[in-house]
């Protein structure tokens, strides 16, 4: 099955502590979760590891967010949108349901 949200897509958060924020998908996990830049930040207490050149301290990093809590952002309408699939010239392409434009 083709993925409705893919890497490099701009998404908007629909639910949770970061509701309303936008970000770019940096990674799609096989568990149905996404890692979005600047969204769902957590503080991780990092141990120093001189062999790997890692300094210790408190590090902020992005945690995975459930894919059902985000929607793809349609820049033409300025709102969250749904994605559909159709065939054009023998290729399967994604399009926005609200205005039928192709997802870039």
Curated annotation (Swiss-Prot):
GO cellular component, one term: ribosome
Organism, scientific name: Shewanella loihica (strain ATCC BAA-1088 / PV-4)
Protein's job: One of two assembly initiator proteins, it binds directly to the 5'-end of the 23S rRNA, where it nucleates assembly of the 50S subunit.
Keyword Cell membrane belongs to the record: no
Family: Belongs to the universal ribosomal protein uL24 family.
GO biological process: translation
Official protein name in the record: Large ribosomal subunit protein uL24
A Pfam family matched in the record: KOW
Domain of life per record: Bacteria
Coiled coil: none
Keywords per UniProt: Ribonucleoprotein, Ribosomal protein, RNA-binding, rRNA-binding
Subunit structure: Part of the 50S ribosomal subunit.
SUPFAM superfamilies, per database record: Translation proteins SH3-like domain
Single GO molecular function: rRNA binding
